């Protein structure tokens, strides 16, 4: 399988992006060991929009790695998506899916990447309970409900989601070794050996 790893972490204020870089490298090493072909982009290092469109077209799967900042992605990853997805007009998506005959239906169905998948791997200082418990901060919406707009941006291109991986409590109660092992297991479960 051809997999594009996009590291959306960035250095800003007290965040240095080290843990997300670690997880990005765990994914790269694990997937290569499983026999998959990997390309990568580190958003904070810069990118060429047209090259990124080609990478997305090349990939069967995109794995996004990023920290949860103010309930979403770091701004450079959002900018990446705005710039690269827009540059991909005609290749990543044809239109918004609607027709003039029925302009209220089929919005978001103009994507061209129907055979592609994407996966989110994200880190949060929030504990898992903040996402899962009704009455807690995210009111039981779970991580995927919290990330609805990120999912919809990828689904607008026609891609389908793979199971999300989330590491919680990364500042107040970090457990890096446990998280790394859990991520390796997740990658093995989702992707398995390329030769299987």
Swiss-Prot record:
GO terms for cellular component: cytosol; nucleus. Keywords: FAD, Flavoprotein. FAD binds at residues 15-22, 68-71, 107, 123-126. Pfam families: Flavodoxin_2. Transmembrane segments: none annotated. Its cofactor is FAD. Disulfide bonds: none annotated. One of its GO terms (molecular function) is flavin adenine dinucleotide binding. Belongs to the oxidoreductase MdaB family. This is Uncharacterized protein C5H10.05c.
